[in-house]
Every structure is written in C-alpha cells, then in structure tokens.
A protein has these predicted regions:
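Acidic-enriched and Gly/Ser
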Residues: 1-95
Length: 95
C-alpha cells in the first residue's frame, strides 16, 4: 500500500449553512477525497410533489487528507472550521 495513502485520515469539516454541495465541489476541484452523505425525501407542496436531496448531517462534510494539509481544506470557500477535540483535529476511524 502507498505510504502517502496511509497518512490520509478522514476528518469532519463544518461548513456555512446550506453550503455542503459547494464545499464538496470546491474540495473535489482541489483534489481531495470527499464524502457527503445524502438523503432523498419526497416533499409535498400545495401544487406538487418532488423528490428532494439534502445532507444527512447539515453543515458537515467529510474529507480524507493528511492532517498537515488541513489548512488547505480550511481555506476552501464555504468552510467554517475543521472539527477538533481540544487542540487536536478530530480523526474519524475507518471501523
């Protein structure tokens, strides 16, 4: 396995409200691996019904990156912060 791939960890990123798709697209352009879990729900209005997609976790997106590159993630348009426990970036386990 590639040693560079071994250093990559999943981190959670907090976005501006309703900017999850924008952040996903911007991070993909920068070459990051991104995961944005989406739910589909049928919504009903007075005149129509429609399937609507929305994020499972509002204002959160997951990025696989080396911890040292988290600054590049933070500099992405729409990103508010990288989730941390204390002063350390929170790493999401693969299990």
């Amino acid at each position: 396995m590639d040693s560079q791939q071994d250093n990559k960890k999943w981190i959670a990123v907090y976005t501006k409200p309703r900017h999850e798709k924008t952040v996903e697209n911007e991070l993909l352009k920068k070459g990051f691996e991104v995961y944005l879990p989406i739910l589909k729900e049928r919504r009903k209005w007075s005149d129509r019904k429609k399937w609507v997609e929305f994020p499972l976790f509002r204002s959160y997106i997951f990025v696989k990156t080396e911890i040292k590159n988290s600054l590049f993630v933070l500099q992405t348009m729409g990103v508010v912060n990288v989730i941390k426990f204390g002063s350390e970036i929170a790493v999401i386990q693969n299990d």
